């Protein structure tokens, strides 16, 4: 891990974040601590220029608006055009049709390299379903169910899928047997706002 951080710092990638307004300052500081250079441009009018010079694009739908979604769409198109990696954090996707419709249309239009969400959020996208109770809602599922869901998402969208929770699951373009898990997550992470957002900001 130390070797990875040193390589990251030596490269100092520029990461464009259109992220949750609740945690935007924390995201910038975490990326700086990891050796990246964050930029938080949000105006649709500058998306092509900003995204075009970046090394990664981090999208988070946690605080949506028409303007922010339009900015994300423009940025994602530019990232896809230039083969810039895209991370999509599905925060609260099942809470409203507004969020769901945007995510589904974006996934239809561009290839996303990493999809990240809790179990309820990934399930909502796979099943096109609602989840009530806010952005922190998580379903309970055993290990095989969570792994199967992660693999379904990875296979459907041709990407890496990360399901976060008490145990994290990471699936690639693979069979279920190739889904990896990490059970070193802390339950305390669910007691503080934005810990999942912080995690997705480091995935570039």
Question: What does each model-identified segment do?
Answer:
Residues 64-67, 92-96, 169-170, 189:
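Short, small-residue-enriched loops and turns at beta-alpha junctions
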Residues 50-51, 125, 190-193:
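Short, charged, surface-exposed secondary-structure boundary motifs
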Residues 17, 39-41, 86-90, 114-119, ...:
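General beta-strand structural signal in soluble alpha/beta enzymes
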Residues 2-88:
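Conserved N-terminal subdomain of the carbohydrate kinase-like
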Residues 124, 193-204:
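Short, small-residue alpha-helix embedded
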Residues 179-195:
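Short pre-catalytic strand/loop immediately N-terminal to key active-site residues, enriched for Gly-Thr
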Residues 98-178:
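Conserved phosphate/ATP/ADP-binding segment of small-molecule kinases
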Residues 68-117:
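Glycine/small-residue-rich loop that forms an oxyanion/phosphate-binding "nest" at active or ligand-binding sites
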């Amino acid at each position: 891990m130390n070797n990875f951080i040193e390589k990251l710092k030596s490269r100092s990638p520029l990461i464009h974040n259109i992220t949750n307004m609740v945690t935007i300052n924390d995201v910038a500081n975490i990326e700086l601590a990891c050796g990246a250079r964050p930029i938080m441009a949000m105006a649709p009018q500058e998306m092509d220029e900003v995204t075009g010079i970046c090394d990664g694009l981090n999208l988070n739908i946690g605080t949506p608006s028409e303007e922010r979604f339009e900015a994300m769409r423009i940025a994602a198109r530019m990232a896809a055009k230039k083969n810039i990696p895209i991370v999509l954090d599905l925060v609260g996707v099942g809470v409203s049709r507004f969020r769901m419709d945007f995510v589904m249309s974006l996934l239809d239009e561009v290839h996303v390299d990493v999809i990240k969400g809790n179990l309820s959020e990934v399930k909502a996208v796979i099943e096109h379903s609602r989840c009530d109770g806010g952005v922190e809602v998580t379903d309970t599922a055993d290990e095989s169910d969570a792994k199967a869901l992660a693999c379904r998402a990875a296979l459907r969208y041709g990407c890496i899928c990360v399901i976060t929770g008490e145990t994290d699951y990471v699936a690639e373009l693979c069979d279920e047997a190739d889904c990896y898990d990490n059970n070193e997550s802390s339950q305390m992470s669910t007691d503080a706002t934005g810990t999942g957002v912080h995690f997705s900001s480091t995935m570039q």
